[in-house]
UniProtKB/Swiss-Prot annotation:
Gene: CYL4
GO function terms (MF aspect): arylformamidase activity
Gene Ontology biological-process entries: L-tryptophan catabolic process to kynurenine; response to cold; response to salt stress; response to water deprivation
Locations listed in the record: Secreted, Extracellular space, Extracellular matrix
Biological role: May be involved in the control of plant responses to environmental stresses.
Miscellaneous comment in the UniProt entry for this protein: Plants over-expressing CYL4 exhibit reduced tolerance to cold, salt and drought stresses.
Protein's name in the database: Cyclase-like protein 4
A GO term from the CC aspect: extracellular region
Length: 267
């Protein structure tokens, strides 16, 4: 006997569908449900806290290197708009430096011969950018020197380390004006890491891995042999120290020495 229409209706109403986009309230299922009111929910954690987004979202007040004005209001523009009737879809235009917000550095950033030889972000090793990572707290009263590195007792075999510093406590990535007093690696700290550890990915919580006074010397040490990948301006505020699985994916920008990146940790 074929089920009655009423029975089919009861079966269908008893099924609870998972939202396709968990960050927004669901409409009636229509792709053009303009009458529904959607409320955007922005989160740092997903899947019950198992996945943590450690990238900073791009905004006008985000700091930029040696700028008092931050990213500015012109970095993201809606150039074609449905609302004013000029188009059937919205189209935005993005204008940023390659080292804005959470980003990676390629060897060509500080070595001109590497830049012209093609060592751009498209050549970075995804096997280094993805895998187990250790998050450590750095002593809050110092830049990252050789003595500080030695005091952290990072075990041999650890290949990816995220360094949380006073920058996170001071919320420097939430302040529009660039701050030269940020914490970073001194040249001797970078050299100690290269000489005494197996680290191949270095992550930090402000715009540069190198302290302001030794910014370029620290970069040169890290990138000279093209074995270390630098990830800068990470959002580490709500993450506890420990071991995670890191996934960090820059854009495939052929010819660029840097790229914005989306980085997540999985517990």
């Amino acid at each position: 006997m074929a089920p009655t229409p009423l029975f089919l209706l009861l079966l269908l109403t008893g099924v609870t569908a998972e939202p396709a986009h968990p960050g927004y309230a669901e409409g009636d299922g229509s792709s053009c449900d303009v009458a529904a009111v959607a409320v955007a929910e922005r989160r740092e954690e997903f899947d019950g806290g198992r996945i943590v987004d450690i990238s900073h979202y791009y905004r006008e007040e985000m700091p930029e290197w040696e700028s008092a004005d931050g990213t500015g209001g012109g970095f993201l523009r809606l150039v074609r708009s449905m609302r004013n009737g000029s188009d059937i879809a919205n189209f935005s235009e993005l204008r940023l430096t390659a080292h804005s917000g959470t980003h990676v550095d390629a060897p060509g950033h500080v070595f001109d011969h590497y830049y012209h030889a093609g060592f751009d972000v498209d050549t970075l090793d995804l096997a280094i950018l993805n895998g187990p990572a250790l998050l450590v707290d750095v002593p809050r009263d110092s830049n990252i020197t050789a003595n500080v590195m030695e005091s952290l007792h990072i075990p041999k075999g650890v290949r990816r380390v995220l360094f949380r510093t006073l920058n996170t406590d001071r919320k420097l990535m939430w302040k529009k004006e660039f701050d030269t007093s940020y914490v970073g690696f001194m040249k001797d700290g970078a050299q100690w890491l290269i000489d005494n550890t197996d680290i191949r990915l270095v992550g930090v919580d402000y715009l540069s891995v190198g302290a302001f006074d030794e910014c370029i010397p620290a970069h040169l040490v890290f990138l000279e042999k093209r074995e270390v990948i630098l990830v800068e301006a990470l959002h580490l505020e709500h993450v506890t120290p420990g071991i995670y699985t890191l996934h960090c994916l820059p854009l495939r920008l052929r010819g660029s020495e840097g790229s914005p990146a989306r980085c997540i940790l999985i517990k």
